[in-house]
Amino acid sequence: MLSICSRVARIVPAVAALLVLACAALLVLAGCGAPALAPDGTSLAALGRARSDVPKLGGCSIFPSDNPWNTDISESSVDPNSANYLAAMNADTTNLHPDFGHDKHYGIPVTLAPKKTPFVPMKFFSYPDQSDPGPYPFPKNTQIEGGKNATGDRHALVVGEVNCHLYETYDTHYVGPGWRAANGAVFDLSSDKLRPDCWTSADAAGLPITPALVKYDEVQNGEIDHAMRFTVATTQAAYQHPATHYASSITNPNEPPMGMRVRLKASFDTSGFTGESLVILTALKKYGMFLADNGSDWYISGATATRWNDNDLDQLKTVSASNFEVIQLGQLYTDC
């Protein structure tokens, strides 16, 4: 916008000052001069290049365009400690693994709560002091990770269409008329606001889960336009924003911190890949993925869908994690 105004100003010098003032006002109204900030005031836009559009789910935009989940990091600098981080994550001996597939109990489901969904009580039994209080708009048929009788993480992810807020819980159980969970977090999808420092969420890193999931419809449309989520077995007792929490007592500086972002190298040859795997690998070069939890090494999270083609996804299992690089880290937080 400023470049256009500058050209006109050179043509008509008499109105140059007025044009500069007008363009500045337009930029303020457009929000161009107000980058997303972390709790400490650090600009999150520095993590990558913002864009003009954002992913959508259930009629809701998934965070603003300058949010870290939506930024292009294909040209971001590589961290000088990248090789050591990769070694700690067993990159040379581990391949990617899609933690989702066609089985209805595989992956993490997302529930869309229509605008008329009632808000019901939500009680927390493990981390109430780090949870956002209820009520939550959880329908009685809210989908649970692994199914209603699952014994695993039992994540519940709900997009409330009435206010475009994201509600995520861990170890979730229906008790009628409401729910109980180990902990819960609420994210305003129109805001860049992070959770308080040292607070967890339904994810160990204090991050939202839903924006990170590989979703069937977006893959079928040919493009994933956001960062993804992955796990490794051991992490450092540290995090960087947008993460707000760590889940480790390890102080080795070569161990990966929560919120670390990795990217598939631009030089990695994807010409032999097809279908769903090709779409995922292409996005990993552009948006990468955040380290979000302790778990199996290099497992990528996806949404539940019986339409996934497992044979297609299995191509990812041939990709060595050594083909990734760690993006330049920002400030690390270690005092929780």
Please name every model-derived segment:
Residues 41-336:
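Short, surface-exposed polybasic-aromatic patches that bind anionic ligands, especially phosphate groups
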Residues 1-14:
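N-terminal secretory signal peptides that target proteins for export/translocation
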Residues 5-8, 37, 47-49:
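Intrinsically disordered, low-complexity sequence elements enriched in Ser/Thr/Gly/Pro
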